[in-house]
């Protein structure tokens, strides 16, 4: 193995790239900050220390996330912990819920699921986990807020297994809850980690007592220990044993209990992500699978963020490095346009703060300045024609028809929507029967962002109105004659999206079911690949 390949393999083995997913208010933002605190990226709560020694307040990026048009961003943070480079991708809350959230999950190798132990599994968690399941992404689970009155722990595990359809292996177990929360018992190390409230508590302050039968524990809290021993006996008999193999296959989730606001349980999660979560894996491309330890650079764009810096009205394409070594100034081939670009101003992130990248390896997320030529799903390489797959469009859940007040601006509207559709800001459907263009989204905020960007970037004042569409499905058929017949017969429901793919716009659930039954040769798709055009 050459020195370069040996170094690439070494760097890749020390990369961990994961997303944090949760329902809003489960404590995700707090946990994100605490992970940064434990890693040393934050020197004190509220102040993030950049790699060059510069500081900025974490409240800066939290405030930015609240602003419209910027809150659609998913924060990307890179930090070092235990000789590993960790790439953490945060996902936005439900007001900002968009396809952007889904696509972030295509760029990671594992996910950390945060659940409010008082509420259990909630709607957005279900949606996000379903997306993780598309790629069998390994999931680590953190039951948060154990210092409050929470639900029964066994009940929570049961709910995760039944609702999310993933088996649980408890790694730590809570001792008491709310005002009587005493800490957690580690099933793997047979140790009790004592809890003491306080947002400034660090690892050095946390006391660990070895052995569940240690007499000191009975002296400290006899009632809770009696209850704990009964529960642990039950848990060992009723729950799944920890298996790294099943975790990596996405079939089993290790479960940790704690309180992020009190820094409790955070160290255990970070260690689990380093010890158990996978390093960057092979990625599927149209021509072959790509090994992260290959010599040549490759990667794909999973997100485009406009106006990250409101002062510069810029656009950044977020690229997940899939193989090789990226070096500043290198030439990269933009495969869709068959064009080379010189990568000199590529950046890395600490949330919205950035610095120029000198080098990057598989698993790293880098930002390429984009002047409108880069689309979501675009692949880059050192020359080889390989387009990465697994970057999906999702069937929209909300629809609006769009028209303009000034008919003279029609061309600008069409151009704007075409570009925004390609960028992935919204899905654009052109009905075959004529009439207004239809926009599709999975979150209301997407429409608001599109309206403001049409006005700011294209000078178009657009009117959005509700459309009588329940859902959209892309469709395909191996038999061209049957495909043409379907399109001709149901012309009133057929549209073409920004990528030139055919879609069926269903007015209601019954209509879609009946259509599927009547046309058994037509295959309906809830997702479609960026890199693959249907019916070609």
Curated annotation (Swiss-Prot):
Pfam families: EF-G_D2 (PF22042), GTP_EFTU (PF00009), RF3_C (PF16658). PROSITE patterns: G_TR_1, G_TR_2. The gene is prfC. Residues 13-281 form the tr-type G domain. The keyword GTP-binding applies. Belongs to the TRAFAC class translation factor GTPase superfamily. Classic translation factor GTPase family. PrfC subfamily. CDD domains: RF3, RF3_II, RF3_III. Increases the formation of ribosomal termination complexes and stimulates activities of RF-1 and RF-2. It binds guanine nucleotides and has strong preference for UGA stop codons. It may interact directly with the ribosome. The stimulation of RF-1 and RF-2 is significantly reduced by GTP and GDP, but not by GMP. Its main location: cytoplasm. GO terms for cellular component: cytosol. It comes from Chromobacterium violaceum (strain ATCC 12472 / DSM 30191 / JCM 1249 / CCUG 213 / NBRC 12614 / NCIMB 9131 / NCTC 9757 / MK). It is found in: Cytoplasm. GTP binds at residues 22-29, 90-94, 144-147. The keyword Nucleotide-binding applies. This is Peptide chain release factor 3. InterPro entries: EF-G-like_DII, EFG_III/V, G_TR_CS, P-loop_NTPase, PrfC, RF3_C, RF3_dom_3_sf, RF3_GTP-bd.
């Amino acid at each position: 193995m050459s020195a370069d390949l040996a170094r690439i393999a070494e760097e890749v083995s020390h990369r961990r790239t994961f997303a944090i997913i949760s329902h809003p208010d489960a404590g995700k933002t707090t946990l994100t900050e605490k992970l940064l605190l434990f890693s040393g990226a934050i020197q004190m709560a509220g102040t993030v220390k950049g790699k060059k020694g510069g500081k900025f307040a974490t409240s800066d990026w939290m405030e930015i996330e609240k602003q419209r048009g910027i809150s659609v961003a998913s924060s990307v943070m890179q930090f070092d912990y235990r000789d590993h480079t960790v790439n953490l991708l945060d996902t936005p809350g439900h007001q900002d819920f968009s396809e952007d959230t889904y696509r972030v999950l295509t760029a990671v190798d594992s996910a950390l699921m945060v659940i409010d132990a008082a509420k259990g599994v909630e709607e957005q968690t279900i949606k996000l986990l379903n997306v993780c399941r598309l790629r069998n992404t390994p999931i680590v689970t953190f039951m948060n807020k154990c210092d409050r009155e929470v639900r029964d722990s066994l009940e929570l595990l049961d709910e995760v297994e039944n609702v999310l359809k993933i088996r649980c292996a408890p790694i730590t177990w809570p001792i008491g809850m709310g005002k009587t929360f005493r800490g957690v018992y580690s099933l793997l190390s047979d140790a009790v980690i004592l809890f003491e409230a306080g947002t400034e508590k660090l690892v050095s302050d946390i006391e660990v007592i070895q052995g569940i039968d240690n007499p000191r524990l009975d002296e400290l809290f006899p009632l809770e220990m009696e209850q704990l021993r009964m529960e642990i006996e039950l848990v060992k008999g009723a729950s799944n044993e920890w298996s790294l193999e099943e975790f990596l296959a996405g079939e089993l989730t290790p479960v940790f209990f704690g309180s992020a606001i009190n820094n409790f349980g955070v160290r255990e999660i970070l260690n689990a992500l380093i010890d158990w979560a996978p390093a960057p894996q092979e990625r599927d491309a149209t021509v072959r699978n790509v090994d992260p330890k290959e010599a040549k650079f490759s990667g794909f764009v999973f997100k485009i963020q406009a106006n990250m810096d409101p002062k510069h009205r810029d656009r950044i394409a977020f690229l997940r490095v899939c193989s090789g070594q990226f070096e500043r100034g290198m030439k990269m081939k933009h495969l869709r346009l068959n064009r080379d670009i010189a990568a000199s101003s590529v950046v890395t992130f600490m949330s919205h703060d950035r610095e120029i990248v000198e080098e990057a390896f598989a698993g790293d997320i880098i930002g390429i300045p984009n002047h409108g030529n880069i689309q979501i799903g675009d692949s880059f390489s050192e020359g080889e024609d390989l387009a990465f797959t697994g970057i999906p469009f999702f069937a929209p859940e909300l629809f609006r028809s769009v028209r303009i007040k000034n008919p003279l601006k029609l061309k600008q509207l069409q151009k704007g929507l075409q570009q925004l559709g390609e960028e992935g800001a919204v899905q654009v459907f052109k009905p075959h029967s004529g009439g207004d263009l239809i926009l599709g989204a999975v979150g209301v905020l997407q429409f608001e962002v599109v309206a403001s960007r049409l006005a700011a970037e294209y000078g178009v004042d657009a009117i959005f109105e509700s459309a009588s569409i329940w859902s959209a499905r892309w469709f395909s058929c191996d038999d061209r004659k049957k495909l043409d017949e379907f399109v001709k017969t149901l012309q009133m429901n057929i549209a073409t999206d920004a990528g030139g793919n055919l879609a069926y716009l269903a007015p209601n659930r019954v209509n879609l079911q009946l259509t599927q039954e009547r046309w058994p040769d037509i295959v309906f798709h809830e997702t479609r690949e960026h890199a693959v055009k249907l019916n070609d």
